[in-house]
Every structure is written in structure tokens, then in C-alpha cells.
Amino acid sequence: MKIISCKSIIVSSLLALSATATAGSFNDISWTLENEDNLPETDASGCALKPSTSTSTSKTFEFGLTDDSNCLDGKQRDEFKYQRRTGYNRLTGYFTIDGNYSDFNKMGVAQTHDHSTSDTGVFSIYQVRKENGSYIFGVQGDSNYSNNGWSDHPQVKISLDTRYELIIKTNGLPNGNSYEDANLYLDDVKIWSSSIEVGGEEKQYKKIGAYQLTGGEGEFHVKWDSVKLYTGK
């Protein structure tokens, strides 16, 4: 698996992009901003505070699995969940991982779900893993599809205390035909791209925040800002 160094970010990014298979196309899609029509709610099993204003889609959110956030006591997630959507939908936003909590591994920052993710459906976890002292960003998809495992997708080295833009585009279709594309940017330069072949139900929802994966450990704090949701046609 090609791991990209931020020192050669532009050249290496092209190599990673060429290694990505495309499950479907998002060309010529017209996107409409949802604004207050898709406000986030607290994940029922998490400990994030529900936003209280209609401008929450553009606010800055802090998520943490830390000793001082009361999210390590039997909680493995601190996330916001957006409403279900069918067809074309898109999430854009910027995340920054707090370098004060650097001793972590296997933490998710964004996800796409339908309600039966353990068996079928869109199930993508955009995550950061610590490998040999480096922080690696990548994705794993629905485990029913062998080409959607973590090691089968491009990965890129990222830095803590650095603001990255993540754009996730999904087309929720029936009969196992759904698909998703995602891109990661640093200073408006695309450094990573991947596609998920997911199948499953057409109604899905996006999540952002801090999520401890199986085998994950350590304290983790991430900030999201300028989060926007779109529908497409």
C-alpha cells in the first residue's frame, strides 16, 4: 500500500489517485446547500452535546475522547449524526486533530451509514491510525466487499494541529448499487482520494466527530469547522 509523504505531497498524491478505482461517477452533478434543513443530532450512544442553533451547519464543533471530556467512561464515540438522505448527497468540512493528545490509534473522524451497516449498505469510516510514529489517514468500507478493507485503499501521512478539508460524495441507490467518493485537501491541494463500493440501502446518513475503532486506544480530540451538507441532482 502506497503511503504518501507530505514532503512530496503533489507528486505522490497523483500516484495515490491513479490507484483508486471508481465505483460510479459524480460528474455533472448540481449541488444544493441544505443549510438548516439538515441539522446534526447527538449519536444516541455517544456523549456530544446537541447543537441548539439553526446555524449549526457552519459552526465549529469540538469532539473529544479524553479524560476531561467524560467520554472515556464506557463511551467510545463523541459524534454528531445528520439526517438520512437518498440519492446524491455530499458532506464538506475541515477537521484539525489536537496535537496535545498525540498518543492515540485507530480513531475515526467521519462516517457514512445506513441502518444495517453490519450486514449491507454504505459503511465507510474515515480514520487516522498511528504507524511507526506517523499518523496515517485512510478509509475502510463495508466488510462484505473484499476491496473495501483499510489496506486496499490509498493512505496518506498527515500532521496533527493541521487543518484538512474532507469532501465525501455519496450516491445512495437501492439493490446494492450505492457508491461513495472522498477527497482530502491540504491548502486547497488534493492529497488523497478513494472510492467505496458499498451496496445496500439507499437511505444513508453522515457522521462527524471522534470514534474509537475496534483496537483503538488513547485520548483523541478533533475540531470540525465549516461543515456543510448538500443534495445533488
Swiss-Prot record:
Compartment(s) where it occurs, according to its Swiss-Prot or TrEMBL record: Secreted
Keyword entries, A-Z: Lyase, Secreted, Signal
Top-rank EC class of the record's enzyme: lyase
This protein's name: Alginate lyase
Reaction equation(s) it catalyzes: Eliminative cleavage of alginate to give oligosaccharides with 4-deoxy-alpha-L-erythro-hex-4-enuronosyl groups at their non-reducing ends and beta-D-mannuronate at their reducing end
A GO cellular-component term linked to this record: extracellular region
Residues spanning the signal sequence: 1-23
Originating species: Pseudomonas alginovora
EC number: 4.2.2.3
Family listed: Belongs to the polysaccharide lyase 7 family.
GO molecular function: poly(beta-D-mannuronate) lyase activity
